[in-house]
Amino acid sequence: MKFIVKLFPEIMMKSKPVRMRFTKMLETNIRNVLKKVDESAKVKREWDKIMVLVPSDRPDLVEAFADRLSCIPGIAHVLQVNESTFESVDDIYQQTLALYKEQLVGKTFCVRVKRVGNHDFKSIEVERYVGGGLNQFTEATGVKLKNPDMTINLEIDRENLYLVVNRIQGLGGYPMATQEDVLSLISGGFDSGVSSYQFIKRGSRTHYCFFNLGGDQHEIGVKQVAYHLWQKYGESHKVKFISVPFDPVVTEILEKIDNGQMGVILKRMMMRTAARLADKMGIQALVTGEAMGQVSSQTLTNLNVIDRCTEQLILRPLIAMDKQDIINLSRKIGTEDFSKSIPEYCGVISQKPTVKAVLSKIEAEEQKFSDDLIERVLETAEIIDIREIATSMDTKITETETVGDVNSNEVIIDVRAPEEEEKDPLKLEGIEIKTIPFFKLATQFADLDKAKTYLLYCDRGVMSKLQALYLQEQGYENVKVYRP
């Protein structure tokens, strides 16, 4: 079994040197991701595609490889194929008949052929020969060239024949790290998760900067969003997660700043702090989830005033998107349920926020801040490799809270996403196992029997630890992490 990875069309339009660089980077990214699934993964780059070989003795890897390939930026689509050689057009037909005969029963179909190399036949001749044979010797209802029930795709590459078993839609975009790094201001809400995803998809290593206004509980929720985005779409490269305790800034805003100017000034202080961090990390741009007119601080006038606080480039990929479209995209990329469970933390609430801030007035208000305010905030910022989120959770979860054995009064809760749980369900004889996805646990945990202890389980132990800490922050003491 092989996968043929087709490049995103915009890559194909690049000059030869750029196309080569992008393709090499995509090959490396695919290898980095698939090696985490299985060390035996083999990836081979060609001029217009990348081949991924699945070991013949490991058919169990096919689904896992397909799932990972569908989430790697830079891929238009992936063809799962059976590879063979052929001697003639009739041989191609016989192989196609053997594979598709049962699938064609009661269906209309067409045959599409792509061909590379010198042959004594044309692609359309193969389509007609194979299609005619299938129409005559199967129980298909007939050939239909437009909108058939089934399209049979064949690829002929010199002496090799590829029978397409499955076509997997890719993520599109550019390969990770072909564009410059960005620092995304992430709050855990719908907007910041989607804006981060869009830059991952466009090929930028996306680092995360979180301004903590809601304590540990807020930070745990945001880390789940960032970790999910990285693990699913950007796992090929290391990125940083920065947590900035912003309480000192909020305190001074509430004590010193005119009520109507608070929202704009809070955003300016965030941008200044993020710009300093970006400079330190050699990052060229900040990314936010702001959309024009969504809240009072996001009018064009206010956004212009916010931008004036730094020379750093500020990018807003959602600027003209409707809220419902943003939520729909968050659902597609898997962050919607995270964002739903994170409360809205608003550090400063103006009674009558300005929608037309005046730069001179804003700057005059900012003169009231302590001179060393941003320096003090930066000194307390925590910068970690996003892969260390699990390790940082370990320092907060004691050994007694992580268990490998299950007692009679304990119940295991499988917190994996439904599709992951269905692929490999957890089974333990004599043990009660509940399946509650991580994104529903916060709302459903209160309904469980409080007399029992619950052990949270996931494959890698990251989401289970984050959820355990989240519940402990809410005051639940009957929760632990299960690591068999």
UniProtKB/Swiss-Prot annotation:
Signal peptide: none
Pathway membership: Cofactor biosynthesis; thiamine diphosphate biosynthesis
Protein name: tRNA sulfurtransferase
Entry GO terms, CC: cytosol
One function term, GO molecular function aspect: tRNA binding
Cysteine disulfide partners in this protein: C346-C458
Gene behind the chain: thiI
Ranges where the Rhodanese domain occurs: 406-484
Keywords of the record: ATP-binding, Cytoplasm, Disulfide bond, Nucleotide-binding, Redox-active center, RNA-binding, Thiamine biosynthesis, Transferase, tRNA-binding
Function, in words: Catalyzes the ATP-dependent transfer of a sulfur to tRNA to produce 4-thiouridine in position 8 of tRNAs, which functions as a near-UV photosensor. Also catalyzes the transfer of sulfur to the sulfur carrier protein ThiS, forming ThiS-thiocarboxylate. This is a step in the synthesis of thiazole, in the thiamine biosynthesis pathway. The sulfur is donated as persulfide by IscS.
Residue span(s) of domain THUMP: 63-167
